[in-house]
């Protein structure tokens, strides 16, 4: 089989870089953070410029953490400043480097998701100047994989030269720089970008490019820590490995040779992927990714509330989410026969002594390691595949009442339409043989079915009209009464993309 060459490209601090360019500022010399300050200081920062990161600030921290770290850094600068006094501020890294009397300042830019998507589209058009779309996989808004195997000879370039040519074109077109990883498979190019490139010096344009093959991976990264730096190794997997004496990918590779059964016992079939990656192997190609079709599909909607909600207000939000999810089904020509609901409770249920005294149920830890009541989770089957708002809304409301503890405060919820398929492929209700009996009034049943079909047809026309108006005049052009109730969130979320300001 022909050896392949892959390039992964990650746009550097993408959201923050866009905000800098739009202000006429250099992303490599400006202290800027993208965060929605209107959501309080606990809001998550979507991006931080490299210069601000140099003060020990995480790229995905919370705004109050950024402010605290800058305050600490300024305290250190004041201690070292002439006369122990700071005489001004600057958000430019270069000015701060040459003038120790300046305090560190930074710009807080509210997110503009629609604008970032426009930038991402422009950058993708640059990629298409060099690589065909069938050889590109868009991994996220700021990251892509490319199979460049068949392009190196065409351009008479090495992989590094081609990567640099593409990145410099992006820089010239948009003013945004990038990091690249080159590898003999998708895993190695990703790891080269995520781990190796971070430890090399950037060139004058802020570009970093790193290369890996299987041999170099084993030589340089078998001893790398922490394990969570590696693609697809989360905290849970790393914790299990460490509990069993494996702290590096080299340890995992050694275990796969000496005691492979242990890995399968710990991770089941997922151990195969972990073992492959420990050796620097990855058989999946971009061609295989493009050809993949999932055996089952779903559509989902999730939401984390800005503050804890009582159950009735939370139910209102779930109903809003369900309503929009059904419209999404209709828009895509899809139907579902099962709804799944997950509701996560707030930490206040256990930190408030009065509420804690009333709760005697199971407890689990949230992603931050804090104890919270165990989340509610359940599913409900529909009579047949449908995209009826009325039917699905009733089912989800019934499911909410069945699984949610009415005495607990809710913080997050996820609604999923399961077993989704195109309406044309859906099996018809009562398709096939029907068992007859002497006690059923089939004439009345037939009339009832006709009335039901007519109601569904009317509902479908209303859904189609609603979608047409929303597409033409905006998502908030039509609102339901429930969207105006206290605690409703749909109106605000309609002005967002991915939960952030559009």
Give, region by region, the residue ranges found by the protein language model.
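Acidic, metal-coordinating catalytic segment for phosphate/diphosphate chemistry
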Residues: 18, 369-502
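A glycine-rich phosphate-binding loop feature that marks nucleotide/adenosyl-phosphate handling sites
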Residues: 184-187, 276-279, 335-347, 409-422, ...
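Gly/Gly-Pro- and Ser/Thr-rich, intrinsically disordered tail segments characteristic of DNA damage-repair
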Residues: 1-276, 282-286, 445-502
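Short, well-ordered secondary-structure micro-motifs
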Residues: 191-192, 351-354, 425-428
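Short, charged/polar surface micro-motifs in flexible loops or helix N-caps
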Residues: 12-14, 38-42, 345-350, 420-424
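DNA-contacting surface of Y-family translesion DNA polymerases
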Residues: 8, 103, 229, 239-410
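Composition- and surface-driven signal marking solvent-exposed, interaction-prone regions
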Residues: 80, 337, 354-357, 428-430, ...
